[in-house]
């Protein structure tokens, strides 16, 4: 079977299955298991700052002593230099799948201590480690800082953006690659970014139909397993063909997303409204406080007093009732809400009421 599969890979191009729905490339809706990026972190020292460093923090001093010791410089016991021109930093980077020794990585540097700005600084060579504690890259270079911080002698400050974080494009060199192990596993596994049973079935059918072999199986809403021959070269060709196949993805479920704090409402096109009548009133309560001065009668030995006078006015705005016809769509909802001049907060209340009444056939997500 695998011999026929290999022949099919090199004889056919990755064309899409015909379908009436919206077709997307398989590579855009998921990824192969194991082919992921890995996070790297490290600790380092940035030098060359114009008096905006950590000053006398203990861990900054220890870090600088460690850097000096690598060059054979030993500071006398009890000497803790004031490091206004240096700062302790945390370094982060992302190691892509299949990254090879010698390749360059972009890195982000963030101050750990009291440094006011990293502008103009240079990162001294620092190791970057993975979650397993192994060193995968070495970082060094001049920082590019977009922020600016200025302190005046009178205590006033001016800060633009974030001056305590910066980046070094290509600032790390890969020293060790990560073995993904995809060439020796019994099967390839493709994971959908968003689980959907229909899409999972369609992906498996697209692979089997294009390659002419029943090698792909939909395991669940997220996972598709693929029988594949051994060997990195053949598997790479197979994965390339699969990634570029097109499949008709399932229609997204009807969903309304509401952010009550900001008044943001997002309604997708699958939302439908059952027959229902809606009215939404607006009440305004206004309270006016007017203090009144009360003077005592002449020769009464009374005291001047202040009396509060309150006037409460309640206004309720009359708004018409509107009706949704059977199967009302997103356009109908927007048109009706705009007609009554509802605010985002009003729309949130209307949608919640529609859901409670069972008239909105959609999932309501409140952030």
Swiss-Prot record:
What is the name attached to this protein's record?
A: Flagellar P-ring protein
Q: Does the keyword Manganese apply?
A: no
Q: Which GO molecular function terms does the record list?
A: structural molecule activity
* Biological function: Assembles around the rod to form the L-ring and probably protects the motor/basal body from shearing forces during rotation.
> Which InterPro entries does the record associate with it?
Flag_FlgI (IPR001782)
Q: Which residues form the signal peptide?
A: 1-18
Query: Member of which family?
Result: Belongs to the FlgI family.
Q: Where does it reside?
A: Periplasm; Bacterial flagellum basal body
Name the UniProt key words of this record, in alphabetical order.
Bacterial flagellum, Periplasm, Signal
Q: Which GO terms describe its biological process?
A: bacterial-type flagellum-dependent cell motility
Q: Which Pfam families does its entry note?
A: FlgI
- Mainly localized where? periplasm
An example GO CC term for this entry is: outer membrane-bounded periplasmic space
UniProt feature coiled coil, ranges: none
Subunit structure comment from the entry: The basal body constitutes a major portion of the flagellar organelle and consists of four rings (L,P,S, and M) mounted on a central rod.
